[in-house]
Amino acid sequence: FRKELTAAGTDEAKLLEAAAKLRNLIMQGNLPEEVETAIRKKYQKLGEHIRVAVRSSATAEDLPDASFAGQQETYLNVRGIDKVLARVKSCYASLWGNRAVCYRCNQGYDQLSVALAVVIQEMVESEKSGVLFTVNPITHNTEEIQINASYGLGESVVSGRVTADSYLCDKKGNLKSCQIGSKQTQIIYADEAGSADTREVPVSTKMQQERCLNEQEIAALCAEAVRVETHYGQPMDIEWGIRNGSVYILQARAITTLKMDHSEENRQVAEYIKNSTIKGKEKENM
């Protein structure tokens, strides 16, 4: 398979053909016995049918400035060990999804230099969630924190499905400016009887027009942001959730470049993939 990828070079059509083969091999195959056993034991310790998020975490040792945000799959509100194991395989397969392969090809990254870990986290049924940057992504002011927030699970904000509230604060948690987004929908847990993991529902007009976060929540988020940034010693991009007044840090990654904010980077990637012609092949969005 490595030979096939190497032979494909930067030819997108050949790369996608090879990637499709690998995805099929992953999905049709079995996880290594020791991996499956470890997952089963840990999941059992969490509790029977506990809800978890199965998240992809891609990296490349030789590409410290690379951003792979949003290129691989994450699954929310997954219940039951069989479904968890299936989602783990889907995460591994998503390293070779057309979106990810096209992104790496466009950026000039070696397809064989990337790796992927899968993280299984107990779900937080967030009432509010979003992302924050411990540096202003527009002005690069390191004394400011940018928070984007909306209702429900964080997928709404991360995927760009909603126009979230935008808060600009100092490192002490003092609000400097706020722009209220429309927040027309939110993503919540799916009904027990349904087959989907999550569902999208409307947000009331009143809640759309209100600020999502209050002063106390903003201060708490900023305090956690500073703590995470101090721990890693560099500006961070953080996904968070709030439930019953408590802040939960769901993901933290270094801001690999301050040339543009990640939302702009992801927009450019999406635009590239949309406009790419792959010799008649219909692109599959894994």
Please annotate each region the language model reported.
Residues D110, A115-I138:
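Structured beta-strand/loop patches that form or line metal/cofactor-binding pockets in enzymes
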Residues A13-E17, S90, G130-M286:
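Conserved divalent-metal-coordinating catalytic cores
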Residues F1-V119, Q208-G233, I249-Q251, I255, ...:
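N-terminal beta-alpha lobe that positions the nucleotide/phosphoryl donor
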Residues S56-A58, E122, I242-N244:
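A general secondary-structure junction signal
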Residues A53-S56, N77, V119-I120, F133, ...:
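General beta-strand structural signal in soluble alpha/beta enzymes
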